[in-house]
Amino acid sequence: METVKQLNKQEFTTKVADIEKSKGEWKFLGERPAVIDFFATWCGPCKALAPVLDELAADYQYKDRIDFYKVDIDQEQDLAAVFGVRSVPILLFIPLNGMPQMMTGGRPKSDLKRIIDEVLMGK
């Protein structure tokens, strides 16, 4: 079972935000908080971060019900441009209410768990 689902632009516009219709205005379409990993297949730090995100996705999948997605910036250049992604990895944390927050670079699992708990779960 895939714990971190890769999204293309069409899936992103139905599961996360319709970036075509809501230019300049954030409207989250998801039913659960989400974490999105902007990555590249050639990126060493992205490869190191991937298993950590898989572990977190498994940890939060049932307990707190958070969706984990990934976007390949080489395949989905439009999405990367919308979010100003110029380096990878970049993580986008999307709470149910409020504005999303971006974080650059890979972090240890403990740091990511703390950020998820604070930003997405309000703990």
What do these predicted ranges mean?
Residues K47-Q61:
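Typically the conserved alpha-helix immediately C-terminal to a functionally engaged Cys/Sec
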Residues N8-A34:
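A short beta-strand-turn-helix
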Residues I66-A81:
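Structural microenvironment flanking redox-active thiols in thiol-disulfide oxidoreductases
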Residues M1-T13, E55, D117, M121-K123:
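N-terminal targeting signals for export/organelle localization
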Residues V35-I36, F68, L91:
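Hydrophobic beta-strand anchors of alpha/beta hydrolase catalytic cores
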Residues E31-R32, F39-W42, S87:
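Short pre-active-site segment immediately N-terminal to redox-active cysteine/selenocysteine motifs
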